[in-house]
Amino acid sequence: MKKYGLLLFLILSISCFSENKKSQQLQKDIVKSKITEEKNISEGNTNEIYKDRMKNFIREIRNDAEKNKYIITQNGNELYFRDGKLDRNFFPVTDGTTQESLYYGDVLKYNAVTKKESKDYMLSLLNPVRKEGKPVFVINYAKGNEKKDFLLKEDAKTGFVSELLPEFEARAIYNPIQGFNSENITNLKQVKNYLLLLNPEKFSDINQYFEYLKNTDFDLLLIEPSHNGVFLTKSQVEQLKTKKNGGKRIVISYLSIGEAEDYRGYWKKEWSKKWPKWIVKENPDWKGNYIVKYWNSEWKNVIKEYRGKLESIGVDGYLLDTVDSYYYFQEKMENGNKIPD
């Protein structure tokens, strides 16, 4: 028994040492990135500044999250590159990524085929990411069996996992492109289909929402875990990790980190009258969503506290949305507009 106890102690010690090394490396990468930013500013090279700030924010979330949490980015796949090559310092920070409207849903037009130029550019980012082993989940906005057949053929070539959503608001139920299965899904690379449901307003309350989710067989749930401010319980989330058919699956919570949302529990009434200094403007395409200075410490604390709630209900990880908000600031900088911190 003593031998087994000693062996277990050594295994746990090695595991803790490994995790500490990862944490220390993330901290080093953050410091290194900040030094690089200062150098770029002094030399007038501003192309990477706002991308690097988003990368650092994601690193901080990874460093602060519970062990084994999955982190998936939504769009913004330029983050995985530097100078035209994969950014080896950032690439391992996340576990998967998504891309909206790769094939259908171009410029927020439902059923519209994405222009070849846009599609080819997105593929130039996604193909290297996938070949390097990171799962890629493609979100298309269209309908029709012919489109489903097309996506199946494309996925066979690329290794992506695509779905066809019936609307942009991600509030409707749909059948997956690949059929359901009863396999145990223990990591993102095993996922063959997923449910993206970010707006559960069609359900009467959190319990009806939970009952629906519980009775599905999707491999992966990418969901909003609350309804009208009421969150799923830890027990409910744990039940959702089993498909209706008995197979295990993964439950990921939506988390927007580049925009503030006035319908979230963290939103304070006074912000509607006077914005905090870290809110820049309202997103013209999505009412109630506000572009933020995501590098601001106050905003980071807002996200940290909100993420604490998500941790407490036991989700398997986070779908980090609006990571591509760096585009807004980068464009401002390129046009000669100074952005105060």
Describe each model-derived feature in a short phrase.
Residues M1-Y4:
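Positively charged n-region of N-terminal signal peptides that target proteins for export
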Residues L6-L8:
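Sec-dependent N-terminal signal peptides
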Residues I14-S15:
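C-terminal motif of bacterial Sec signal peptides marking the signal peptidase cleavage site
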Residues K21-D341:
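Glycan-processing catalytic domains of CAZymes
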